[in-house]
Each structure stands twice: as C-alpha cells, then as structure tokens.
C-alpha cells in the first residue's frame, strides 16, 4: 500500500515537473520570438529613419540647384549648373550668409566658380544689400581669377557692381597660342517693366583691361528676362562692343530652378501682372537669389591671324 502511494506521488510530481518544463520552454520560446521581433523592428525603424534623413538632406540640397542652357549667337552653347546653399540665416537680425558654386562648360573648356555672399535685409525687408567674393578657375588652361561685388536688390530695381582681378599670368592653350586672363569690372542695372513685376530689362556695361598694349574691351549687354511657371526663366539679349574686333552677339538663355519648381508646382506661380506700375514690397524671398556676375574668365589671346589679338569668354 505504501509503495503504491509513493509511486502515485512520484508520477504526480514527475508530471507536474514535465508540465512546468513544457510551459517554461513555451514561454521562453515566445520570449525569444518577442525579442527577435522587437530587435528586427527596431533595426528596421532605425534604418528607415536614417534613410529618410539622408533622402531629406539630399532633396533639400538638390532643390537649391539651377540649370542653365545658353545659345550664343546661334553658334556656341553654354551649359551651366549653379547651386546656392544657405550657411547662416537670422531673419530677426536681417542677415544671411550663403555659398554659391557653379560649373560652366563652353568651347570644350570648363570653369569652376566658388563664392561666399553676405546679405542684409533693410527697411522692413523691402531692401537687400549684399557683398560677395568669388574665386574662378578655368582648369583646362589653368587661368585663375578672383572678384568682389556689391548689390542692391528691391522690387522696383536692382544695381550690381563687380570687380575682377586675374591671379595668373600668360598660359598656353591647346592651339599653342598664349592667353592672358584680364582684369575688369562691370555694372548692371535691372528694372521691372511697368505692371509686369516678373519681367525685367537688364543693362550692363563692362570694361576689360587689354594686355601688352592692346586696347581695352569695352561694351554693354542689353537683355530682357522674364520668370515663367514651374521654375523656368527666359532671358534674351545682345552684347555690343566698342572699338573692338569682336562682333556684336545675340544670346538666348533658358534656366530651370529646382527650388522654384518645388514651391510653384501646385499653386504658387510668378506674378505676371500687377495692379500698380511700381511698388516697393517685401523681397525676403530673394535673400538666396543667385549672384549675377561674369562667371567665364575673360581672356586675351595672341593669335597669328590678321588682327593678332582676340578676346575670349565674353
């Protein structure tokens, strides 16, 4: 009788232990699955977050991109890529700092432009005053140049002045001719047409100092520039030269601005017609506008032709 009781109790204990073991194993297995599930979701969430931040950063940088194609007198085509990147912005203090860079391809040569700009917003953000400095490098031949510039931007007109200084001496190009980068300056006045705030007429005068006894290259450029829908901009004009062997040249330029496209693709479009001819309004949106300047290095080339000297880059 005692043996039977002991055997029965032993079986009950063994069964209970087995049940507890199975239950513990099941719970342990569920816990492992939960840990794996949680770990995988955490990893996926982290990867999605990092990927989203990278894509957002790239997208924001890409939006500050401008692509320009210019047909020069039906002969040469110039391709340009610009970017303007904010470095500092304090609208309460009315001050912004930015970087501007560009790469320009023309006549089998490429030019790199790197610049820093500082702008101040004055008179309730109705006036922008700016200063800038640039470094230019035409690496195919090795020309280098720097410039400093100033600008005044308003809704009723703009004024820009740039002074250029060559940093290199004579260089030999692929044709075996000597080229020299020139010092010079330009001044531009831009005025919107009455009742057409998105259309401006630009008048620019320039003067490039000739080398080795050559006459200065002087002239002016007159153009009409208008903003179109979805980030496009069209400019057409002509360049005339004074006392130079260079012939007058016409040009047409089409620009696509990615930032303007993203902000205008749904509702915001350029204001083509205004109720008033001229009105001084807020120009805060222009604080990171591209600096207008002569990005191609102007050069004087010594040739063996009839005239012996010709100017390039303008």
How would you describe each model-predicted region?
Residues 62, 88-98, 122-131, 156-161, ...:
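Repeated loop/turn-to-beta-strand initiation elements of outer-membrane beta-barrel proteins
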Residues 35-122, 126-138:
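Outer membrane beta-barrel translocator domains of Type V secretion systems
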Residues 81-85, 114-118, 133, 148-154, ...:
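Residues on the lipid-exposed face of transmembrane beta-strands in outer-membrane beta-barrel proteins
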Residues 23-25:
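N-terminal signal peptide c-region/cleavage motif recognized by signal peptidases
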Residues 3-13:
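Bacterial N-terminal signal peptides that target proteins for export
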Residues 69-75, 103-107, 118-120, 135-139, ...:
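Transmembrane beta-strands of outer-membrane beta-barrel pores
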Residues 28-58, 167-202, 208-213, 227-235, ...:
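Flexible, glycine-rich linker and terminal segments associated
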Residues 63, 75-81, 107-114, 127, ...:
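Residues that define the transmembrane beta-barrel architecture of outer-membrane proteins
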